[in-house]
Design a protein with these regions (language model features):
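Conserved catalytic core of nucleotide-sugar-dependent glycosyltransferases
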Residues: 140-206, 211
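A structural signal for well-ordered alpha-helical segments within the folded catalytic domains
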Residues: 16-19, 111-115, 212-220
Length: 299
């Protein structure tokens, strides 16, 4: 299995946490893992390594630039409430849509991530998998390739961290997308990729009723592919009932990685309180690892 890990970072966050994430992949992932770091007109020579490539996403994806230009002055498309003439409107009527601005509706902000992924999928012919990693992740010990092979089945188009509670039957919550594996050998992946880009090129993202983040559009489209094309997806989150929906470290990924989600960025670690009782054989030993024994109890 040949893997390309991709990530991106906001201006000013390279030294804060993104460099640490990239360093940890180079140190602890299989030695043939390639890394692509997407950026926005930032200095490209801040980091040199034979397995790392920097790509200016605005140069690589002109349709992203067009989308952001179309909607940059529309408060609603940027997560706020104030509507403007001929602007977009929230289609949702649920709890995420009511009464306040929210990142959940910031389509402009999260479009960057989508176009990073779609660029990588279109330009990785010699690879078997593209894996998206958020820049605030950290790989704390060596990860054998066998782990990744087992984690991402060849018959699944996507491997992701689901957060749906099957007992509620309420439409659920979209995935946690700090880690997503895209199977480049799957016969539908390029069609999926084109459809995902077209949600932004054709402004269809604004038709969604639960949110406009990258997680929202990924989940929306993957459900269509599962239903209409009988595509398999691999949910390694399995909804674990975790406070704050921090499924990342409660999945098998917690055996090797941490995700500094939200306030954890400042702390530089997740906390022991982020774990729930492990009942799966794959994850029962996570909290016995030295890294997690040293983690703060709470934040």
């Amino acid at each position: 299995m040949k893997i390309k890990v991709i990530t991106s970072y906001k201006p000013g966050t390279w030294t804060e946490y993104a460099k640490r994430a990239v360093d940890s992949v180079l140190l602890n992932w299989p030695a043939d893992t390639e890394v692509v770091v997407y950026h926005e007109a930032q200095q490209q020579d801040i980091f040199a390594h034979e397995r790392v490539t920097f790509i200016d996403i605005h140069e690589a994806q002109p349709e992203l630039v067009k989308f952001k230009e179309r909607h940059k002055n529309d408060p609603v498309a940027n997560g706020e409430l104030q509507e403007i003439p001929n602007g977009v409107k929230r289609a949702g009527s649920g709890p995420n849509a009511v009464g306040k601005g929210s990142f959940i509706w910031d389509a402009v902000r999260f479009s960057n991530k989508v176009f990073c992924v779609t660029h990588a999928i279109k330009n990785s012919d010699t690879h078997d998998y593209v894996i998206w990693l958020d820049a605030d992740t950290y790989t704390f010990r060596p990860m054998p390739k066998e782990f990744l092979i087992k984690l991402m089945p060849t018959d699944s188009m996507l491997t992701y961290l689901g957060r749906v509670n099957p007992g509620l039957n309420d439409g659920g919550k979209d995935p946690e997308c700090g880690f997503v594996g895209y199977n480049l050998r799957h016969p539908e992946i390029q069609n999926y990729n084109t459809d995902w880009e077209n949600m932004y090129i054709q402004d269809k993202v604004f038709d969604l009723k639960l949110g406009w983040t990258d997680c929202s559009t990924l989940w929306h489209l993957s459900k269509i592919y599962v239903k209409d094309k009988n595509v398999k997806v691999n949910d390694i989150g399995r909804w674990k009932g975790v406070k704050g929906h921090h499924v990342f470290i409660n999945s098998e990924l917690g055996l090797y990685m941490d995700h500094f989600k939200g306030k954890r960025k400042k702390a530089g670690a997740s906390a022991k309180q982020d774990f729930k009782q492990q009942t799966l054989d794959e994850t029962k030993d996570i909290q016995n690892l030295d890294y997690w024994k040293k983690a703060p109890t709470n934040l």
